[in-house]
Amino acid sequence: MSSYKTRVLAAIEAHCGEAFPADTALDLGAGDGWYASQMQGRGLAESVQALEVQLRRDALVEVALYDGRHLPLADRSVELVYAFDVLHHCVDPLAVLDEMMRCTDRYLLLKDHTFKSRLDRWTLATFDEIGNRRFGVPSPRNYQRGWGWVDRLEAGGFERCTLVSPVELAGFPLGLLANKLQFIGLWRRQ
């Protein structure tokens, strides 16, 4: 497995421990299912449902398809909803974030990106293309500018438990450009 994903999971465990163990979790944008398998395998979640807009042949867990807009879950039906490096791939990240808020009963966990300058956005777009093109994952470049997603969560009745940025996920020399653009955040329904 990629050292990047391993570092992401280690950072999430280090900074978001109050959300674990969860009885039920939703892995939104599950990709190959690695995070879902690790969440269960490490005892961070008892049961994980994995959703994705396109299936991958190499999936490690059962992944269900969804339309990329409406999550096929009832309101407040899972204890933890998470998306790792997913929202910026969505056509409408705020609408998907609203769906995540609707479906969680307790915690919402994000690992994604934020940018301030044109150079930051260009850096994210370049890394996104390099990292995702081989999987056929579109990169619409819908990155969070500043903290708009955070504002949406907190206006939607969620209390910030932790927000970490920058996050040391990429080694030298890429980390000089990439780490300042990374964030991990955990919110709890009020």
Regions found by a protein language model. Name each.
Residues 1-12:
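Class I SAM-dependent methyltransferase Rossmann-like catalytic core
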Residues 22-31:
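Conserved class I S-adenosyl-L-methionine
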Residues 31-70:
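Class I SAM-dependent methyltransferase SAM/SAH-binding core
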Residues 35-37, 41, 113-175:
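C-terminal alpha-helical "lid/dimerization" subdomain adjacent to the S-adenosyl-L-methionine
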Residues 82:
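A conserved beta-strand element that flanks and buttresses the S-adenosyl-L-methionine
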Residues 85-86:
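Short catalytic micro-motifs in class I SAM-dependent methyltransferases
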Residues 90-100:
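A short, conserved alpha-helix within the catalytic core of class I
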Residues 106-114:
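Conserved beta-strand signature within the Rossmann-like core of class I S-adenosyl-L-methionine
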